[in-house]
Amino acid sequence: MTKLPIAREGWPFIVAPGIVAAGLALMGRRALAAPFAAAALASLGFFRDPERDVPLVPGGVLSPADGRVLSVEETEDRFVGPAVRVAIFLSPLDVHVNRSPIAALVAGTSYSRGRFLAAYRPEAEDANERCALHLQGDSARVTVVQIAGVVARRIVCRVGPGDKLAAGERFGMIRFGSRTDCYVPRGTDVRVRAGDRVTGGMTVLGLLS
């Protein structure tokens, strides 16, 4: 039996309105059932979790999310040090599952409460609710930050310190879109720029030096 490619966090959003829609339809209340059926179908799309053919690229840093690159900027990260940040905006139509950009040991996570500004706004990086995942690879450190937005109000990180992740492996999701930032060491040969579309676990953001 083929497993439906749906993130497990999505099932409550699919099953609950689906049951209500079915019950109303059986009662002959089709007009009332329609919005619940639409919500269930929309959630099927929102929480889809397709399999990905992860490329084997020596030194490659894979995109941790599907979406559009907002910016590529030099900055500082408390775990990585001097870094380049690739900010990726996820719309509600994108796949919301996050994947590890490198094969690594989870060195730590840090969660910060915050606001729910539009994720594409520059101040969302520091002001919004977020969860940072610090990854220790064989030769480099990388940080991935999940950032909530206007629609996304729930960050899910399934891993913790000491866990091991393969490159492209799922580690969490942001419900209903938002933003994911990837911090790589300065000197990384970044291969994307603002405006590019990227695919989580497949697009190579850059090559570690």
What residue spans do the PLM features occupy?
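Contiguous, well-folded functional domains in the mature portion of proteins
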Residues: 1-209
